[in-house]
Each structure stands twice: as C-alpha cells, then as structure tokens.
C-alpha cells in the first residue's frame, strides 16, 4: 500500500522535475523470475527514485544503514522495501549485521523477486565509476549455490545519465543493459568462490561503463567537456545523427570519451597540448562572457531565423510568462535558496530540490487554488486557475531561457562592434582548436581500422 502510493508520487515528481526522460531497452527486463538490478550512483536520492519508478518490476532496495537511524525511519523504510546495508565507512562494528541483509537478498530471489543495489556504495556526483563492492555478485552466486543453481537469477545493469545533475528541468537517460546469467558462473564458483565473485563484479563494471557516459578517470573531464562544447554538434552532423535525439547525443559523447581515453593512454602529450589550447579559448569566452555557439558558422543560418523567431516569441509570450512567474516563482525559488544556503553536496542537490520543490509546490498550489475559490466562489474559474499552474510554470522557464539566448545575441553584436580585434582573436583560437581536433580524429580513426566498435 505505502510502496504503491510512494511509487505513484515518485513518477509524478520525476516527470515534473525533469524535462525529458529517455528510457531504453526496457523490453530486456523479464516480467517474472529473480533479478538483481545494479546501477551507477551519481545522485544519492534521485537514482533509486528514477530506477524504481521506471523499472517494470516491484523492487526491494539495498540502502546504507545510516538511513535507518530511528525507529520511525526504520518502520517507514522497511515498508518501502528498503533493506539496510552496513558499510565499513559508517561503522565497522556493525559489518556482521550484513549477514541478515544477505539473507534477505536470498529470500527475495528465492521468491522470484527483484531488488536494486548500487555497487559503488557511495554517491560522489562525478562522471567516474567508483570501485564496485562485491555484494551484488555474492548475493546472486550464493543464492544460486543454496538452490543447486536452479533459480535462474539474472543481473541486469542500469545506466543512469543526467544532462545536468543539479538543474531543474534537465534531462535523464535510463538504459537497461544485457542480462548477466548467474548460472553461467556455476563452474567458476565451485572452483573458486572469491574469483567467481570478482569475475561477475568485473562484468558488472564493464556493463555499467558501457551504459553510462562516464570517464575512466576524472583527469580527462575538462577535455571531454571541451569537446562536447565545441565539437559534439559538428560530429553528430558529420555522422548523420539527429542533434535533438538523446540516444544519438549519448553515443556521440561516448565516442568522444573513448577517443580521449585512448589518447590519454597512448599519446598523453596530445592531451596536454589540447588542454593548453582549450584553456586559452575558454578563458577568452569567459572574458567576453559569450557562448561558443555564437562563434560556430554552421549554426549561423539557424541562428538568423532563430533571432527573428525569438523576438516574436518574446513579444507574444510575455503575458503568459508573467502569469507563470506570478503563480510559480515563490515555490520555484525557495528550494534553490534552501539548498544553496545549506551547502549540500553536488550529488545531493537535485534530490533536495526535488523533495523541497514537491513540498512547496504542493502547498502553494493547494493554498492558491483555495484562495481563488474563496475569492470567486466560481468553480469554473477555480478549475481553470488550477489547470494553468503547471503549464504556465513550464512556459515561464522556457521563456526565460529564450531571454538569456537573446541577451547573449545582443551582447555578441555589442562585442562585434566594440571589441572586434578580441573577437577575431577568439575566432582564430577556435579555428586552431578545430583543426587540432580534426587532425587528432583522423589519427585516432587510423588506429581503429579493422576494429569493430559498437556504441549502440
């Protein structure tokens, strides 16, 4: 009962928080039978909500034991299908209690149930997969061993990728990976239990890396982000991909990441050279306070039409924008203020924004609708008012983004007339970067000849 209610609320909250939710390979998930879902963990609270809401199975969740630190919390979380996991970093003395947690995992699988576990064990908020704990592999193998390897347990990896981990109305992609059949490791387990657990964990890690836009190390983060900034759209066009397609966007980021990782391993001096050129270019962008897209000739035609369309949109849409601000600004800004002043970790920001936002918007919408009813005593007016709240809020956000784009355009024109020499300098830097990228790309592609690289 409580699980079902929270599940419905979670789906609604997630749809309101994110602009676009892309779900891939959901058909892979079996409708019945024992399944262990494993996912990466960039966002401590949002990840289980998203995975649990869009997984086609009722789930149990293995969560850190510190969440169960009061009798009330324990009562609630237990009824939400949460199972405590005792971590060494929290309290080494309680590690022995994990026997009960593992036992619960066996029971779930033996009853053809499914549970979700985050094998990283921590949520850092970076695009780097942390060292995986072996719990998922151990539970799966030991459950099969206790039942003569007849349970037919599958481990299904889930890749969670956020376009922006902390921004409201950003995008998220959920990718289900190929099932890992635990029975396939029966011989390995009987030969050497520890090695079998490590083998399954290694396969899980490989799968999660394939399903996410993660780096092997955060030392190349600035390089990949720089390429995504100035070259991703051009590469997508060159590859015949759709710029607005989230899967194509993901694949392109993966291609760029793989290329950078190859260079870091084989020709690191090119990484150093590119980092220097990139930092000089980004410094000029910041100095002029403009975005890279305004320097991209490929977007010029689209931008010219976009300028006219934006002006018309800003004029025609201004009344609805004002209505959206009046009816949504207070519950929109309060969560941001609270999260900012409380200095939350980046991996927690979006989660707390979602929690506070859901509370404030619910209270504000109910209170304002009640007020309108009290003032008008008109059912039709009250219904129209309440129905307008969410769409007008979404429109206000979209409108404000267009205002920012237009301000950038005006600033670009101002720079063109007042700081032309500096603008030409930054354009020259950009051209040098693109030439360096093209040369590096061709050199990298030469190394891939004869190799079968699959990003789908």
Regions found by a protein language model. Name each.
Residues 349-355, 359, 370-391:
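Hydrophobic alpha-helical transmembrane segments
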Residues 1-23, 71-80, 307-341, 365-376, ...:
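A transmembrane-helix-recognition feature enriched in membrane-embedded lipid enzymes
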Residues 2-5, 29-94, 331-346:
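Catalytic core of membrane glycerolipid acyltransferases/transacylases, capturing the structured
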């Amino acid at each position: 009962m409580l699980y079902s209610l929270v599940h419905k609320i979670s789906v609604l909250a997630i749809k309101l928080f994110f602009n676009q939710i892309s779900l891939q390979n959901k058909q892979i998930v079996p409708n019945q039978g024992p399944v262990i879902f494993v996912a990466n963990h960039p966002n401590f609270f949002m990840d289980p909500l998203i995975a649990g809401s869009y997984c086609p199975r009722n789930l149990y969740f293995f969560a850190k034991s510190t969440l169960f630190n009061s009798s009330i919390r324990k009562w609630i979380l237990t009824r939400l299908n949460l199972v405590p996991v005792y971590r060494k970093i929290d309290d080494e003395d309680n590690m022995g209690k994990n026997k009960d947690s593992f036992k619960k995992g066996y029971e779930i699988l033996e009853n053809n149930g499914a549970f979700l576990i985050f094998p990283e064990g921590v949520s850092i908020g970076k695009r780097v997969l942390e060292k995986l704990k072996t719990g998922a592999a151990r539970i799966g193998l030991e459950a099969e061993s206790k039942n003569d390897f007849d349970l037919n347990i599958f481990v299904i990896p889930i890749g969670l990728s956020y376009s922006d981990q902390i921004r409201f109305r950003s995008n998220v992609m959920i990718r289900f990976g190929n099932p890992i059949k635990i029975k396939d490791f029966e011989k390995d387990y009987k030969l050497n239990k520890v090695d079998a657990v490590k083998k399954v964990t290694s396969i899980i890690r490989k799968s999660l890396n394939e399903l996410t836009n993660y780096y092997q190390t955060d030392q190349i983060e600035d390089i990949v982000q720089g390429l995504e900034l100035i070259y991703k759209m051009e590469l997508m066009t060159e590859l015949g991909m759709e710029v607005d397609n989230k899967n194509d966007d993901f694949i392109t980021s993966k291609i760029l990441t793989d290329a950078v990782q190859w260079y870091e391993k084989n020709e690191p001096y090119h990484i150093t050279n590119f980092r220097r050129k990139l930092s000089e270019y980004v410094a000029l962008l910041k100095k002029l306070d403009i975005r890279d897209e305004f320097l991209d000739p490929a977007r010029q035609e689209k931008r010219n039409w976009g300028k006219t369309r934006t002006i018309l949109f800003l004029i025609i849409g201004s009344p609805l924008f004002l209505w959206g601000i009046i009816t949504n600004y207070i519950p929109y800004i309060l969560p941001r203020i609270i999260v900012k002043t409380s200095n939350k970790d980046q991996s927690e920001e979006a989660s707390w924004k979602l929690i506070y936002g859901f509370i404030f918007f619910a209270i504000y919408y109910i209170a304002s609708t009640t007020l309108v009813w009290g003032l008008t005593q008109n059912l039709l007016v009250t219904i129209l008012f309440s129905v307008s709240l969410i769409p007008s809020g979404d429109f206000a956000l979209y409108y404000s983004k267009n205002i920012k784009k237009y301000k950038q355009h005006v600033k670009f024109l101002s720079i063109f007339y007042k700081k032309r020499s500096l603008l030409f300098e930054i354009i020259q830097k950009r051209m040098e970067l693109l030439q360096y990228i093209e040369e590096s790309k061709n050199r990298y592609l030469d190394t891939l000849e004869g190799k079968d690289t699959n990003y789908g």
